[in-house]
Amino acid sequence: MDDISEMTMPRIQDLSASLRNLRRPWPNQWPGLPLVFDRVLQELGLGNPRKGSAVHRLLGFGRAVSELVEQDGVKRHAQGQEPAYHNRLHIADTLVCMTYLLKTSAALNVAGARKPAVVAMALCIMAGHDFLHPGGSKMHPGELEARAVHDLQPLMAAAGLTLAERQIVKDCIMATAPAQVKGIHLQIRTRPYDLRQTDCLAVLVTEADIMASTLPQTASSLTQSLAIEWASQEPEAAEKLLLPQNRLLFLEHAALFSSPAACRLGLNAVKLRQVKRIEHELQNA
């Protein structure tokens, strides 16, 4: 495929509106994660890749992942066992957030941002980054991410991903482990940003993963959902999630945004406004 054509600069208000639209049908009228996946790839100009191309096999992998996540989510939801946070809606959130980061990157002429294979890879990673997540957090650091990578291997093989492509998927998913996020942002801060480099793409993946939890329009409901998910295994940690002090810790140490796209969208300004408001409330409590 040729490079993706020029794109208009997205606005963070439009991202918030897109996330609201995802929530309207959830969960009873949910159209399905495969439809969300197809819509974002159409929005990014990936609708008709050449058969046998890297884009074609990557999107085949992404669709297969989306279908399996949807099937698993429907089954677990019917049993009352779908995680309250790490569910199909979270995957859809991250696909939409990644779409806005990619569109902004393209509008900024970030290196690699208009390469169809890079864009397809980014979408596939978001579709699979929490593959068949069991819910909860009582695991060793990186265990859930490693499990997702392991469980994705047969799907990557079936789709014909090369060893190099599988390694990119692995590296980017492992970068979303909370203990790894700060390091990956520091790793690329002194270099020109190029999405063809795995660590730069990994930064975008970590940003898309927590963006909906950062935006004030969706943060509260997502924090409550995560607390519900944790409650059975770690009730004390679940209660602490809802405290303003914990929100402050999340904004200052976990919600990291350093890519050109995230900076242009104004994510750090969004964070700063929340931090100042919470600090003011705590001082006057």
Residue ranges and their predicted role:
Residues 2-47, 85-86, 97-118, 128, ...:
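Divalent metal-dependent phosphate-bond-processing catalytic cores, especially two-metal-ion Mg2+/Mn2+ enzymes
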Residues 80-85, 121, 137-142, 159:
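Short, charged/polar micro-motifs that form catalytic or ligand-binding hotspots
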Residues 94, 119-136, 148, 171-177:
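His-Asp-centered metal-binding catalytic motifs of divalent-metal-dependent phosphohydrolases/nucleases
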Residues 64-96, 132-135:
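Active-site flanking loop/helix segments enriched in acidic
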Residues 50-56:
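Low-complexity, highly charged intrinsically disordered N-terminal segments
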Residues 105-112, 138-139, 155-166:
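Inter-helical turn/loop segments and adjacent helix faces that build the functional surface
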Residues 91, 98, 145-185, 245-250:
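Histidine- and acidic-residue-rich, metal-dependent catalytic cores
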Residues 62-73, 122-126, 169-177, 204-208:
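Short alpha-helical scaffolding segments that buttress acidic/His motifs in well-ordered protein cores
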